Amino acid sequence: GKTANRAEEARLATGCVGVRRTTGQHPGGLVVIPQENEIWDFCPVQHPADDPNSDQITTHFEYHSMEENLLKLDMLGHDDPTMIRMMEDMTGVDAKTIPLDDKDTMSIFTSSKVLGYEDDPILGPTGAVAIPEFNTRFTRGMLMDTMPTRFDTLVRLSGFSHGTDVWLGNAKDLIISKTATVDSTIGCRDDIMIYLISCGMLEKRSFKIMEAVRKGRGLPDGAEEEMVQAGVPDWYIGSCKKIKYLFPKAHAVAYVMMAFRIAWFKVHHPLPFYAAYFYRRSQKGGFDAALMTGGIDNVIANIDAIDNNEDASAKDEDLLTTLEVVYEFYLRGFSFAPISIYDSHAIKFLIKDGKILPPFVAISGLGESAAWDLMEGRKGKTFLSIEEVAAACPKVSKTHMQMLKDAGAFGSLPDTSQISLF
């Protein structure tokens, strides 16, 4: 170690004040350090769980405190590629070959007719439930206000939803009042620069105005007068002044391409779509077999219970998202097979005889460790009783065994192997 005098110790200690002790999971921000430096030239570091032997080091300093000196990359995890890969594996379809102008797929953003139901009282007029970017009640409302029929309109809507003060109190009002069309409103950063250049303004000035607006700084000095002289309408100038943050168009295009491919599977390969979606939800604790596999009436009752509960928790709201998709799954004529000790996978939703077979982790409270233990314990075995299953799977608790029994996973297996002679 290094020796330091009291003054240096006090200086270093001051720099550590306010640092978090617990690390938890980081979403994947990577701080890039120049080759001739080390991270501790800029800030202290931590080892996860205070384990000095760990290869991973993290820092919990607010990034803006060092953004003038260091580059940070946000390498965030994404669910959509996982879902697409699963659907590719189940169907043999390469997602990159999916046409982005498929009419049936495009239609679900305005109508659910192609899915076999219309104007549902729970899901509304569109078929966009479970489609990334467009699956919340807020974005489905946005679809109804704009009725998109082209891919580029979906890109604009993605910009609306990811921006701050871009849709509500801004573009939405302009569209509903017919002051502007969807295509003429500001959705992404690039829209401003391209539009101003088309009005005859200088490219560099158009870029500077776009940069100021997208960061929420309003219009630069003199810009409003220049825009008026170029023939930019008052409503457009007013819209620029309201914006606090604008999404980049390339980012929106990437998101919408992914969403459209997933929507294509929903229309043309529904069972693989739902199997992949439910898997994704179950990985986050958002799928509960007890609430979701008991038929459409049971699902409607659970949706109503959460909707009518003013004190619904964040977990309830998360379950509601899945319940809506399960409701649609039933509405389209599909159903679940009962969880089976012999056939269910530990974590994946399987397609069996035209039905979806939930995994063991779909049972609330049964974790992956116990689920894999069940898969391992059943290999090459035919059980005579539930007691034998418990003996073969030591990581599965009595509580879990009861949950499996309640879910019908054991079929007609008796509790014990003992035979009564009388």
Give names to the regions the model predicted.
Residues 1-422:
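Noncatalytic, beta-rich nucleic-acid-contacting surfaces in large DNA/RNA-processing enzymes
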